[in-house]
Amino acid sequence: MCKEKIQYIEFEDFVNNTGVKESTIKRRYKKIPGVIKTKKGFRVISGTRYPYNIGNTKLENSASKRFTLLKAISKYQYISHKELRLEPQQFVDMLRDLLSAGLIQRNNLCNTYGANAYDCTQLGDEFINRTDKAAKNELINTIATAVGTFTVTVLSQVFDSAA
């Protein structure tokens, strides 16, 4: 969550931001991390997103899971390790890979459930606009390049300090 006090947005603003009917959000509020029902109505933590519809998505391998994660972040929708059928640490590692490849960035909002703490960069949005197959292949290469560059940098620093 936020380092300072938790910030809230108006329920009406959340409804407007999501593009989903108010009645649907009220009915499904328990499935939306960050929406809290009170006696006076609903409170929404800043940065809350409506869940990504993963129904027709094929999660065949890690590339398709990474692409789905990037797509959900790009659409400002909630997704977590559960929807991607991953262990929590694998999910964190995928987020770290996308972050190091420059495809996503932290958004500094209060809701950090799942991938809510991240937004797509311009490069990430460009991947989403390509065909799925081409984007998945290039996504793998981009992440591998970013991770490889990081690994080589760390190794060279280790060897330099040992010498």
Spans of features found by a protein language model:
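Short amphipathic alpha-helical interaction segments
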Residues: 21-28, 85-106, 112-115
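Short helix-start
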Residues: 29-30, 34-57
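Polyanion-binding surface elements
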Residues: 1-22
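Short, amphipathic alpha-helical interaction segments positioned at domain boundaries
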Residues: 56-57, 115-146
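Short amphipathic alpha-helical interface segments
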Residues: 1-4, 56-85, 89
